[in-house]
Every structure is written in C-alpha cells, then in structure tokens.
C-alpha cells in the first residue's frame, strides 16, 4: 500500500474513532485496535522510541500491581479475567501515535465536540418527547435501535445504555473544548452553539457528580484562558438555560442535601468501602471483589445490598488494589499534570491554539477526577476512552513544538 493510501486509511480510522467515542463503544474499541495494528504494520517511528510512550512508567506500574493483586486475591481466576479492563489505557499511546501534529490534535478535539453535539440533539429529543409510558421502559414493538434510543427517557442518555455515561463523557469533553471557544475565529458562533447544545444535554442527564466535575473543569479552564470573558459568557448562558428547566433546577437544589436518598446510599457505600479497605489495606480485595464482598460489608442502613462499585473512583481503586494501587493510580494523573503544566509554561504566548489544547486537556482531567469522587468513572469504559484520548493531545503538542525550527 502506498504512503498516501496508508495515511488515508489512518485518517478514516481516526474519524471512526471520534464517532465511536460519541455513539458506540464497539466502534471506538474496534477503531483503536485497527489503529494500533496500523501503527505496527506501517512500522511507524513513533512506536520505536520511549518518547512515544508518555506516562509509560506510572501506567505500567499501576497495571503490573493490578495484575499482582488480582493473582493474590481470594478468587484469582475471576480477578485476573477482570484485568482486561486495563487494556483501554493503551488509548493514550494509540491516539498520540496517530495524530501527526497540533493541527491534527485540534481537528480531533473539534470533531469530537461536533459528534457529541449531534448526540446532544438526540438526547434533548429523548427527554422532550418522552411519554409517561417510556420514562422507565421501552416500547417492545419498536425497532431495536429506536427502542434503545427513545426508551427509558426519564433522563438523557444519548446512544449509551445509561445517563451516567453520557454525563461523564459530556463533562470531560465540554471542559476540554471550552478553551477552544476563545480561539475559534470565524467558526466561534457555530462552535459555541455546538458547545451550548452539549451543555444542555449534560444538564438533562441529571447526573450531579458529572455537573460538579464539569464545574471544576470549567474553573480550571478559566485560569488558563486569556480571553476569559468569552468563556465566562458561554458558561453563564449554559447555566441560565439549564436553570430555566424545572427538573434540572430541582435536581441541582439537592446537591448539598445530606437527607437525599441517593446521598444516603452513597454514604453507606463509602462506609462499606472503608471497612473493606481496613480489612485489606495493602493488596485490596482484587478486581471485581467489591461485587462479591459488598453484601458482607454493607451497613444496616444500606438499601442496596448488592453493587459492583462504590460510586467513588479513588475508594474503588484502593479497595480493589490496596493503598499501593491507589498511590500508583494517583501517580498517573500527577505525572500528567506535572508534564502538561510544564508544557503550558513553554508554549509560546502567540501559540494560542496550542495553549487552548493543553489547558483543555488539564481541565478535562480535572473534570474526570472530580466527577470520579461521585462515580466509578475509571471503570466506565466510554468515559475513560474519551479522557485518555484528550490526555494524549498535550503530548502531541509537545512533540510538534519540539520538531519546529527554533
């Protein structure tokens, strides 16, 4: 195959990855596998040097420890099977490898926003056309695709199986793309409409943890956006739009209410998780162990007696992999922040588009980590794939700047 055709194939696969991130985990994972094969098949120079593997040490250390704790758990075969959830971590390196330069990274981020804006339109239609009979059920007589999209429409879920996934994906993507609104140029109006549409869909998920993560990401983004007045105006418009929706406003009023039934259940899960951690502080209970042991550790006030996760990512990591595993997991993100922040300080002041990419990635990871205090989003593959894809973008910028003439 000629170089031209090979690059055309890669570009088509990157486009399919973007679409998959927005609508289908099967499409996104398939695209990633084929892109990885493309890198190997073309013997791409970016897979031959250590510089092509950002965050390699913390990711490998975390993965190795996860496998070790699985092998040492009381149900090693079950836990070792669960280590397949480590495979999505390769997304960081695959996306980094297939994006040539900062321009390609900008196109990737822009296309992701537009793909999610399309999903947001579908999500808004889901909620606004929802009949009482479909609030928590599906119409069995409808075609499968229509049934899955327009069924269970009490809360917006897009093409995902549950609203929490859509909320997590939108929180990360909106934080990542907010800084680009200030440098969008002639496309600013259209891009702003796409961003606001996605923000409305985020509100209609009614996922409070995703809202808080989004808010944290926005605050971080505003610290690095020079034309901050534009970003503030857009965010303010989104908030006003959402507060005009009674269900969204009522849901927001319960965020700090400790008497809220969902909050009480999360407190019960937190207590159970801490008890499990005290019993297995070093190596944890193994991957998948929470599902097996939660009925034993659930406190009397817990309504749910079975769960596979604790709605708190750091606690889930610590319980399943021990405190060592938590430290290694934190190392991944600490290393990312240190390197991306250092890059931001080196980006020339006139390289506004590159700065927006780096600030957006930092804001997106902030949103992911804060939202993870209320949901095990590290275990939500769709959310994790989007986050890792965005995390690759600063490293693309870093490589591009290093290759430019002084």
Regions found by a protein language model. Name each.
Residues 121, 125-130, 204, 222-263, ...:
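A membrane-periplasm/extracellular boundary helix in multi-pass inner-membrane enzymes
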Residues 17-27, 318-321, 355-395:
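Membrane helix-loop boundary segments at the extracytoplasmic
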Residues 17, 35, 67-68, 90, ...:
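Alpha-helical transmembrane segments of multi-pass inner-membrane proteins
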Residues 12, 16-35, 48-53, 64-89, ...:
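Interfacial transmembrane-helix termini
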Residues 1-78, 97-113, 183, 189, ...:
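Transmembrane signal-anchor hairpin modules in multi-pass inner-membrane enzymes, especially those
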Residues 257-271, 283-321:
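Long extracytoplasmic/lumenal interhelical loops at the membrane interface
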Residues 134-138, 349, 401-406:
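Short, Lys/Arg-enriched, Gly/Pro-containing loop segments at transmembrane-helix junctions
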Residues 83, 252-255, 266, 277, ...:
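Hydrophobic alpha-helical segments of integral membrane proteins
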